[in-house]
Amino acid sequence: MCGIAGFVSLDGAPADASVLEAMTDMVRHRGPDDRHTLLLSLRGSAADVALGFQRLAILDRSTRARQPMLSPDGSVALLLNGEVYDAFDARAELERDGYRFRTSTDTEVVLALYERLGLERMLQRLDGMFALVIADTRRGVVHLIRDRIGIKPLYWVQCGRTVLFASEAKAFLAHPAFRAEIDPEQVDELLAFRYIAGEATLLRGVRQVGPGHRLTIAADGFAETRYWSIPDDTEKLRLSREDAVDRLDHLLCRSVRSHVRSDVNLGCQLSGGVDSSLVTLRARAQRADVDAFSIVFNEPRFSEERWIRTAAATAGVASHQFVFDEAGFMGALDAASWHMDQPIGHPNSLALWLLAERSRAHAPVLLAGEGADELFGGYGRFAAAISGTPSSAPHDPVDAFIRATAFHSETRLAKLRPAADLGPAIEKRRAIFQEGRSDHLSNCLRYEMRTHLVDLLLRQDKMTMAHAVESRVPFLEQHIVDLARALPAEHLVGAASPAGVPVTKVVVKALARRSFDEAFVHRRKSAFNLPLAQYFRSKAFVTMMEDRLLPGMRSRGLVDVEVVRRWWRRALSAHPTTEGFWVLVALELWAQQFVDGRRAAHLNSV
């Protein structure tokens, strides 16, 4: 895992090496083990491409493996952030064909595949989590490529005749042509849903390369192309429950086997939930040196410590538990906001930030259970979608499902922002939903993969890479994705249990029942919430609100500050609007850092 930064001059203007160094500085936390920059020319004259790389050395820690990595003739430079898990199968094939490798990295395998197969055939071969930059001077192009699911981030923005790109948008702050401004068209969606679906961001003009997309930059412009789509027309498998569980078990074991490959210590991010517990079990079966790392809370209602201990004991791993409290919350607020690159929609991101900070000394690589809920139907709203549970509003099923994930209705949002208009955001999300061409449940799951999951993966990347910890997600391996898309509904969600708990993620829980008891597997799902009301009452937070956040909100003019005050009072009593209030805090924190340039001295300075 690493940090990428760079830019391309579309008009051939020479690249400024000092600007590249400054941009690369902004992502140095992602890769403290090595740093390398490279200037090259797409047109054979002035150096018009700038490539910067901060390396976190996980495989082949030698200097031979440094990036940017050049092809044998020096005409192609490649940057890879992430891991390609099937690279070693491809390596064996290439070696049989006579290719001689200089390193043991997946980066060199990807470079060889590009040279041998070309871009399109190479992309069809890659299974992993990655952001790729390929500068091909023979063809006069630069390719920006993101993995199929969107596990690793890659941002870009055009500033005049220069295209900037980076693993984190904060790198753009170091380029003199970039001006950080809020895009007003994205604010309503952020406040309602806590994140912005699709490729747009809250920074005007800044976009993400979409999951399964590539952006090709040439002298005459650039174009984005989708090279992979979530499987949609898959014929549903006719499997018994046991056969479905067996198949998932086989694929998860195989995926974890490829995910534990590392030349440094590796651990598991264990929440105590079913998904991370299964990953921990399978990881321990592959490596004896795997430990588990978890966050627990002083407040018993929010802590999963009982289930964490059960999972760790069952897997036979050492359990490291870190307490997250009011001091941890206040201590992480500014730093986590800075590293997130966007307003922190999920307040539990702060706990993940602390987990990565504390676990770094033990394990620079962590396996997580992220993705299983979105693939296999782990949320109650999926059960509602298949059962036809009526919405509280008279909307069609698509509209009802989309709005069910919003934290603020249009009525509530209008109180905060009288001119608010959720229409464009709803229509954009509807268009994403309607890309699906299957049954309603399958389309709901596809929509979650294209929206909510991508946002969760950004959180996973940014909070762990803030401390140079590589997060890996075995449930999102390609064969598991294909299986999930091919399973019929009865293996995903079912009717509520006698206790009134929706039966979700059926096949995953059936697999878990082979190792854990009924109480562990079928307890009501925990959302890993924080005791926010308690933190909001703290003296330190009250001072921050009164002295810094409310004045900032008032001068920014995005929201009605008197409404914010009322919501704050409700949030102090753990009112259901607590997390709705949180996003207002997150927005102002982020805006002060990225737009106003008000950052603590210990954060990256430009």
Q: Predicted regions span which residues?
A:
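Conserved adenosine/adenylate-binding substructure
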Residues: D48, L59-R64, A77-L79, D127-I134, ...
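Adenosyl-5′-phosphate
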Residues: M1-I4, A174, R204-P211, G221, ...
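Short aromatic-enriched loop/helix-cap "lid" or pocket-rim segments at secondary-structure transitions
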Residues: E305-R306, L333-D334, G377-F382, Y535
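Short secondary-structure boundary/capping segments
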Residues: A336-W338, G380-S387, A601-H602
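Short hydrophobic/aromatic residue motifs in ordered secondary structure
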Residues: D34, P153, S276, A372, ...
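Glycine-rich loop motifs involved in handling phospho/adenylate chemistry
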Residues: L266-D275, E299-P300, P347-L350, L375, ...
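A mobile, often basic/glycine-rich helix-loop segment
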Residues: F376-F401
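Cysteine-centered catalytic environments shared across enzyme families
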Residues: M1-M340, L352, A356, R513-R514, ...
